[in-house]
Amino acid sequence: MLSPTKSFALTCLLLGSFARVVLGQYSVQLDLTEQKAYLLYNDRAVMQSPICSGRPGHLTPSGTFHIIRKDLNHVSSIYGRIVDRWKRTVVVDADVDMPTPAGTRFINAPMHYFMEFAPGIGMHAGYLPGYPASHGCVRLPEKSAIAFFQALPVGAPVTVFGAIPRNRQYQVNNRDDNQRYYDRFYNDPRYYYRGRVITPGPFGFWQ
């Protein structure tokens, strides 16, 4: 016969398992080799998306993580661009410590639908050039970022695996293979950032 303490612990375990089955749990897997993200529901892939991960020297860390925080209108605290008084880009890939010539200013890079899973590293909407090019973050197409942002709560598991092979070209797949999930999340105005306009630099300088 189980003691009251063990009986209570077993009850909590069973209730927790039941809640996970009934309520479901979203998680995400990031494949750095194939440059793809997979949204999972109860360990079953329900949506996939192309990504842009960290470039050599700024590699996206591999391992098991959890969503630490979410920020709809996040901006990078380090990276951005330098523009002149007419808002023309002077320096595409700039950082906050870079000297700004007279008449110019530094603009922090927008990282909408930011989902941080490691210190300073997260998933967010951004430009996908077709190869790993970020400063460590994982860029997603806007539609995918909205869907992931709504589906993944703080605490959701994030698994990052694989490695970027050298001299490999990636084909960015933007087909709406996941239209049911896009429609479910993308059309929810609660998850629109102000303006919903992404204007990346020509060489994809954002993190």
Regions picked out by a protein language model, each given a short descriptive name:
Residues L59-S62, R81-Q207:
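Exported/periplasmic cell-wall-interacting domains
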Residues M1-A9:
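Bacterial N-terminal signal peptides that target proteins for export
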Residues V21-R88, D93-F106, H112-Y113, A156:
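Cell wall/extracellular polymer interaction/catalysis modules
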